[in-house]
Structure formats: C-alpha cells, structure tokens
C-alpha cells in the first residue's frame, strides 16, 4: 500500500469510518479535510447495484449541475459549412471538419475535454474512433454530444456551463465531479442533489435489488467521507 503523508493522515483522523454521514455533514467535512494548496475538486463516488456486463444496465446520461464544476471546459466541434462559424460564435474552442480530424489522427491532438458532432460528420469522425473512444471523447447520442447544427449553440453553452456526463466504470461505480472546495456548502449541496436526481432517473429496468448501494464524497487527494445512501437520495435542494 502507498504511504500517506502527515497532512492526509491528519485529515483522515477527522473522518469516522464507522458511521454514515448525512450529505450536509459529509460536504462540510470534505471541505474541512481538503489540504491541497490549490482549489481541489469535490467528487461523488456512487457504487450501483448494476451488472456492467449487461449493456442494458450501464448508466450513460448527463446532468446539468446548477453551479457547474468550477472547471473551464474545452469544447471541440466536428461540423461543416456555416455550422463551423456558428459553433465558434457560441463559444467552442475548436470547430472544423477534415482539418480537425486529420490533426487528431496525425498529431494526436487532444487539447479538449468534450467533443460534439453534427450527425452528418459521424461517418468521418468514426475513422478516429479508435483514438477518441478510449479517452472518452467520442461523440455519442446518449451523452448528448451528437446534435443537429441548429442545436449546436445550446449544447455548447450547456457543456460550458456545467453539463457533465454520468457514466459507470467497469465495476459499476460512478465518479462525478460536483464542484470545487471553494464552492459554498449550498452550491455543493445543490449540485449533489442534481446528480442524485439524474442517477435515480437513469435507473436501468434490469437492475435488481438495492440500486444506490454506497455513496462517498471526497476532495482531490483527501480522504473519502461515507454518506448515508438513503439520506443522499432523499436530499432536496
């Protein structure tokens, strides 16, 4: 096991691992136990009662966090014609067609966080799917990143404003950033409520037994704070 430093151990000592905290208590404790010099990210980790081996039980959806994540999101748009300039005018960091595809393919250009595409571009974008897919950058209708040209501006604004993708890993756990340590408790709470509501709404019909089995809140490099999953699901903004 990796050895932890004194600051981490001091933070860990403030967390009672034998109890489940209310969301309000947990968020306060996450802020208190953050010890990084930079403004750390607050993350929620949810273990779900799903079987990721079955495609129909995997979670892939989006949620618009009311206060965003506190992170500057770099957006790349695959489009052509007038849609390219429209995307740039709406705030996209990069927009183009064959030029961007070639740059990604030849230069391994990945200086962006989210890729959006119009449907007519997917035939070309598919050629670099082997590079975009493993990085979680492949446009997908389930994540709301394949949209008609008329919806580009709205989608770009939503992504820039705090819309995040929710997607379980291969063990059935969600890892979602819900803000920064510098956020107020109210901002973090409202973002957390939005996340929980989205996860509940995305419950697969094939999921058996308890759906949300455990919830943990943490900050960058900080200790995990266990949360009562029932209280987390009942929390209101």
Swiss-Prot record:
Part of the 50S ribosomal subunit. GO terms for molecular function: rRNA binding; structural constituent of ribosome; tRNA binding. It comes from Chloroflexus aurantiacus (strain ATCC 29366 / DSM 635 / J-10-fl). Binds directly to 23S rRNA. The L1 stalk is quite mobile in the ribosome, and is involved in E site tRNA release. Protein L1 is also a translational repressor protein, it controls the translation of the L11 operon by binding to its mRNA. One of its GO terms (biological process) is regulation of translation. Belongs to the universal ribosomal protein uL1 family. This is Large ribosomal subunit protein uL1. CDD domains: Ribosomal_L1. It holds the Pfam family Ribosomal_L1. It comes from the Bacteria. The keyword Iron does not apply. PROSITE patterns: RIBOSOMAL_L1.
């Amino acid at each position: 096991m990796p050895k932890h430093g004194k600051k981490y151990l001091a933070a860990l000592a403030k967390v009672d691992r034998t109890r489940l905290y209310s969301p309000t208590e947990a968020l306060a404790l996450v802020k208190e136990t953050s010890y990084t010099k930079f403004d750390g990210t607050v993350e929620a980790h949810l273990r779900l009662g799903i079987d990721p081996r079955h495609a129909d039980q995997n979670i892939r959806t989006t949620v618009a966090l009311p206060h965003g994540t506190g992170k500057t999101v770099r957006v790349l748009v695959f489009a052509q014609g007038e849609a390219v300039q429209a995307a740039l005018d709406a705030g996209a960091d990069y927009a183009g067609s064959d030029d961007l595809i070639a740059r990604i393919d030849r230069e391994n250009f990945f200086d962006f966080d989210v890729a959006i595409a119009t449907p007519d571009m997917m035939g070309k974008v598919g050629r670099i799917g082997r590079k975009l897919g493993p990085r979680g950058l492949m446009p997908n209708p389930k994540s709301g990143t394949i949209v008609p040209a008329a919806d580009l501006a709205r989608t770009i604004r939503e992504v820039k404003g705090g819309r995040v993708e929710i997607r379980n890993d291969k063990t059935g756990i969600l890892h979602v950033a819900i803000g920064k340590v510098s956020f107020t408790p109210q901002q973090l709470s409202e973002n957390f409520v939005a996340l929980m509501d989205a996860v509940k709404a995305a419950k697969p019909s094939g999921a058996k037994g308890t759906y949300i089995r455990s919830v943990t809140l943490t900050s960058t490099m900080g200790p995990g704070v266990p949360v009562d999953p029932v209280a987390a699901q009942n929390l209101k903004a």
